[in-house]
A protein has these predicted regions:
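Flexible, glycine/proline-enriched loop segments at strand-loop-helix junctions
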Residues: 37-41, 68-73, 127-135
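Short capping/connector residues at structural and topological boundaries
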Residues: 11, 15-17, 23-25, 35, ...
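Glycine-rich active-site loop/strand segments that organize a redox cofactor
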Residues: 15-65
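Short glycine-rich, polar/acidic loop-and-turn segments at beta strand-coil junctions
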Residues: 1-4, 24, 57-58, 97
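Short N-terminal binding/cap micro-motifs at the start of the first secondary-structure element
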Residues: 5-9
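Short, flexible micro-motifs
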Residues: 10, 17-19, 70, 131-132
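Predominantly flavin-linked oxidoreductase catalytic cores and closely associated redox partners
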Residues: 2, 12, 76-77, 81-185
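An accessory alpha-helical subdomain
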Residues: 45-55, 65-89
């Protein structure tokens, strides 16, 4: 992870309380040019699997509208849980380390990183998307997928900012951090 702290996106999600899953999620809730991927992924690891993990770690949570599950306290609990699970699995988290190149080698992969060379039998790239560049989001995952000849589906905006005129922004500033249910038509 090139960041100096793990899980920055997790910590900001759900207004700092981490909207961590929704038991009502089905493949129909995901837009994709490859709907079979969503079916396959959600059958292998369901929202209930993640909820069971959260409960095993004793994280209190609450349901908001339409099945959205949030931590009662803080998204820090989800990050701590994930780091604990990594530790128990023997995974090593390397911060302030960026991957420069990845190449296929006999029986695995070789990574050139900012802190040296690593080799592994299998590799999972969890890099997010392009949604929040200020949080470190880049096109790295797409570049690696292209390098290994994987098909890339066209991307679409999933998270978009509201851009306001300066006068309106100033007028609405006192509402910062306030959320309410809305429908956009």
């Amino acid at each position: 992870d090139p960041a100096n702290h793990p899980g920055k996106k997790i910590l900001m999600s759900g207004g700092g309380r981490c909207n961590f899953t929704n038991p009502n999620s089905t493949p129909a809730n995901f837009r994709s040019d490859n709907p079979h991927y969503c079916i396959s992924a959600l059958k292998r690891y369901t929202p209930q699997h993640f909820l069971d993990l959260v409960e095993r770690h004793g994280i209190e949570h609450e349901e908001k509208a339409a099945g959205q599950l949030f931590c009662k306290d803080s998204s820090k609990e989800i990050l701590s849980m994930l780091l604990t699970e990594c530790e128990w699995a023997g995974a090593e988290v390397r911060l302030k380390t960026s991957v420069k190149t990845i190449s296929g080698v006999d029986h695995g992969y070789q990574l050139q990183t900012s802190s040296g060379t690593l080799t592994c039998e299998s590799l999972v790239i969890a890099c997010g998307g392009l949604s929040i560049p200020t949080m470190g989001a880049t096109g790295f995952g797409y570049d690696i997928a292209k390098q290994f000849g994987l098909a890339i589906l066209p991307t679409r905006a999933g998270l978009v900012p509201f851009t306001l005129h300066p006068e309106l922004k100033e007028q609405l500033a006192p509402l910062s951090g306030v959320s309410c249910p809305v429908d956009v038509h």
